[in-house]
Amino acid sequence: MDMKLLAAGIAVLAGIGAGIGIGIATAGALEATARQPEASDKIQSLFIMGAGLSEATAIYGLVVSIILLFVA
């Protein structure tokens, strides 16, 4: 097996962490909205910002894996 493929596969694992993180954050946001519906606007904006930051790690992993496959 080529080491580039192994390294790219390991870099893609960042997507798993991002998926788990966004899932946990979504569950927390839904629970918080259910407890305090009047604060749903603030909860939603904070959730979207946090989900974007969490998704950035998955995008970085994808970029690294593409670089490893095609450049390295």
Swiss-Prot record:
One of its GO terms (cellular component) is proton-transporting two-sector ATPase complex, proton-transporting domain. F(1)F(0) ATP synthase produces ATP from ADP in the presence of a proton or sodium gradient. F-type ATPases consist of two structural domains, F(1) containing the extramembraneous catalytic core and F(0) containing the membrane proton channel, linked together by a central stalk and a peripheral stalk. During catalysis, ATP synthesis in the catalytic domain of F(1) is coupled via a rotary mechanism of the central stalk subunits to proton translocation. Disulfide bonds: none annotated. The chain crosses the membrane at residues 5-25, 51-71. Coiled coil: none annotated. The record marks 55 as: Reversibly protonated during proton transport. This is ATP synthase subunit c. Belongs to the ATPase C chain family. GO terms for molecular function: lipid binding; proton-transporting ATP synthase activity, rotational mechanism. It is found in: Cell membrane. The lineage of its organism: Bacteria, Bacillati, Bacillota, Clostridia, Eubacteriales. InterPro entries: ATP_synth_csu_bac/chlpt, ATP_synth_F0_csu, ATP_synth_F0_csu_DDCD_BS, ATP_synth_F0_csu_sf, ATPase_proteolipid_c-like_dom, F/V-ATP_Csub_sf.
